[in-house]
């Protein structure tokens, strides 16, 4: 075992003494040392229930014959950090989390890891660490929040009834009392936000990748089932250590293709493009951006999930969960091993019935194509991403007038002041991985556009990214980004921009000669942040089209 390096032999006398100083009895020294990377914090609703899950994981590890050690991993709530300076830090924490898990596991020679996670950047950061370390690992996602409940059976959700409600109030559609009711009911308790936003999409994809146990991706945070999954995961990691089952034996090209197909079938968050690319990078699996679009054209959307649709995570769980989606996808799924001991096709076969009002069959899809599309054109030569499942038919083809803003705050002010009108195409730039820095989510502007009733007449494009709660004609991840001299930096107020989602085109309707002249006059802006972690991050982060990973090259 790896842990023998810190607990066996004469030379490890000091090491054993220190371990005994933590309370480890001599009788436990022969057991596998299992690290539990916990991202508990009472700052995030999705993580406040983790103390309970920690207990069940620890019980499972000890029941399975291992010895548990806990260490803490930070977490950032994208909702709380949204719309201000805090959002600069969200995506960069993904890299910090991967580095911290790697550092503790390697420094202490842990034999295996249980990765307790839930929210947006924490789950991909944990998976990146698992792929990088390639020691036995299992992931426990803490589970979704229930939908909020109101009078006459109304269901509330975080994004629609907070960010969008704010804009509806500003427009006079609802009054202050209605807004207060929304605020009080949108988040009824612990768990990751209720729709198919980034956290829940990543939990589902973690199960699809084979890195968590059945139902882990959809079982509610408040459920006893989640506790049982936590216990079983603790037991299972000891078996994985004994059998030396490592993440790279599971995170194959087939696993990533399966995850993409499930993502597309459900209409998941566009952030998953960044995260799957980054996890594949750590697993040394080649996964070009174009893969998402190739699979989207042959994978129909089978569910209509909140925020763009009517179903919540609780509905998906009772309808069949991940296994139900896999069963409906049938032969489009490739067989692959998992941490659960079953193959992915065996998991699909384990479910008896699927509620086809929630997870439709291939013969009756919600839409003929999957939820994500990859666009390109002279404004995005290395690609851009749109969650087409959240775009109305009226906006699948659109030509608009560029309204240019060099920050999210400037765009948000213009939207809320009524300066954006039907026929406009909002351009938010210098918000990419380097330029932001941190590639902030543009949820506030997109929610404001939807809340003001402009979702069928205004588009938004950016080198930033979007929340999983975003809906509407919002194109992000434009690469190269403005800070690197990408063509989005050359767009001027009043230019015409053409969006053709079915044709996968995003085109600035300006001739090459004019663009060449603008490029000669363009100067890179000074870095927005010159000290601290974000300044270092901006120097080493790569483009969105490669997952916005950090590189030592």
Curated annotation (Swiss-Prot):
Coiled-coil region list: none
Residues noted as binding [2Fe-2S] cluster in the record, renumbered to the chain: 119, 193
PROSITE patterns: ILVD_EDD_1, ILVD_EDD_2
Cofactor: [2Fe-2S] cluster; Mg(2+)
One annotated GO biological process: L-valine biosynthetic process
Pfam families for this protein: ILV_EDD_C, ILVD_EDD_N
EC code: 4.2.1.9
Binding residues for Mg(2+): 78, 120-121, 441
Residues modified as N6-carboxylysine: 121
Catalysed conversion reaction: (2R)-2,3-dihydroxy-3-methylbutanoate = 3-methyl-2-oxobutanoate + H2O; (2R,3R)-2,3-dihydroxy-3-methylpentanoate = (S)-3-methyl-2-oxopentanoate + H2O
Free-text cofactor note: Binds 1 [2Fe-2S] cluster per subunit. This cluster acts as a Lewis acid cofactor.
Enzyme class: lyase
InterPro entries: Dihydro-acid_dehy_C, DihydroxyA_deHydtase, DiOHA_6PGluconate_deHydtase_CS, ILV_EDD_C, ILV_EDD_N, IlvD/EDD_N
Active site feature: 467 (proton acceptor)
Assembly, per entry: Homodimer.
Entry function: Functions in the biosynthesis of branched-chain amino acids. Catalyzes the dehydration of (2R,3R)-2,3-dihydroxy-3-methylpentanoate (2,3-dihydroxy-3-methylvalerate) into 2-oxo-3-methylpentanoate (2-oxo-3-methylvalerate) and of (2R)-2,3-dihydroxy-3-methylbutanoate (2,3-dihydroxyisovalerate) into 2-oxo-3-methylbutanoate (2-oxoisovalerate), the penultimate precursor to L-isoleucine and L-valine, respectively.
Name this protein carries in UniProt: Dihydroxy-acid dehydratase
Biological classification of the source: Bacteria, Pseudomonadati, Thermodesulfobacteriota, Desulfuromonadia, Geobacterales
């Amino acid at each position: 075992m790896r842990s023998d390096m810190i607990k066996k032999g004469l030379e490890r006398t000091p090491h054993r003494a220190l371990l005994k100083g933590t309370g480890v009895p001599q009788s436990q020294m022969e057991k596998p040392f299992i690290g539990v990377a916990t991202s508990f914090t009472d700052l995030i609703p999705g993580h406040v229930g983790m103390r309970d899950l920690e207990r069940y994981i620890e019980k499972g590890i000890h029941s399975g014959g291992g010895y548990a050690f806990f260490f803490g991993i930070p977490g950032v709530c994208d909702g709380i950090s949204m719309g201000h300076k805090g959002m600069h830090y969200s995506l960069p924490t993904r890299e910090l989390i991967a580095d911290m898990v790697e550092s503790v596991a390697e420094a202490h020679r842990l034999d295996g890891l249980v990765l307790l996670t839930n929210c947006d950047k924490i789950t991909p950061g944990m998976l990146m660490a698992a792929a990088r370390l390639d020691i036995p690992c299992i992931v426990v996602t803490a589970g979704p929040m229930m939908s909020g409940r109101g009078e006459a059976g109304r269901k509330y959700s975080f994004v629609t009834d907070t960010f969008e409600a704010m804009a509806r109030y500003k427009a006079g559609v609802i009054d202050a009392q209605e807004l207060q009711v929304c605020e009080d009911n949108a988040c009824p308790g612990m768990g990751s936000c209720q729709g198919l936003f980034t956290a829940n999409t990543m939990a589902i994809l973690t199960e699809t990748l084979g890195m968590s146990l059945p139902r882990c991706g959809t079982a509610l945070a408040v459920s006893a089932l989640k506790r049982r999954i936590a216990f079983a995961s603790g037991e299972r990691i000891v078996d994985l250590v004994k059998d030396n089952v490592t993440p790279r034996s599971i995170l194959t090209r087939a696993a990533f293709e399966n995850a993409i197909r499930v993502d597309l079938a459900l209409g998941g968050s566009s952030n998953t493009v960044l995260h799957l690319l980054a996890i594949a990078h750590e697993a040394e699996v080649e996964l070009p951006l174009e893969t998402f679009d190739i699979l989207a054209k042959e994978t129909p959307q089978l569910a209509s999930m909140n925020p763009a649709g009517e179903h919540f995570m609780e509905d998906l769980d009772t309808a069949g969960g991940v296994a139900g989606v896999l069963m409906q996808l049938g032969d489009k799924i490739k067989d692959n091993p998992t941490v659960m001991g079953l193959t992915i096709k065996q998991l699909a076969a384990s479910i008896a019935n699927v509620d086809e009002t929630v997870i439709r069959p291939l013969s009756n899809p919600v839409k003929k194509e999957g939820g994500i599309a990859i666009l390109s054109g002279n404004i995005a030569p290395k690609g851009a991403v749109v969650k087409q499942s959240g775009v109305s038919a009226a906006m699948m083809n659109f030509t608009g007038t560029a309204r240019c803003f060099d920050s999210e705050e400037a765009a948000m002010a213009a939207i809320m002041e009524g300066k954006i009108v039907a026929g406009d195409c909002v351009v938010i730039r210098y918000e990419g991985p380097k330029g932001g820095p941190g590639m902030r989510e543009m949820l506030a502007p997109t929610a404001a556009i939807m809340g003001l009733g402009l979702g069928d007449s205004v588009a938004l494009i950016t080198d930033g990214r979007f929340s999983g709660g975003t809906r509407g004609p919002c194109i992000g991840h434009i690469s190269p980004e403005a800070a690197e001299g990408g063509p989005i930096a050359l767009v001027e107020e009043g230019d015409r921009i053409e969006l053709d989602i079915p044709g996968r085109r995003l085109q600035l309707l300006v001739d090459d000669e004019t663009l060449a002249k603008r490029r000669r006059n363009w100067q890179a802006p000074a870095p927005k942040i010159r000290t601290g972690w974000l300044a270092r991050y901006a120097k080493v982060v790569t483009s969105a089209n490669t997952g916005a990973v950090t590189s030592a090259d």
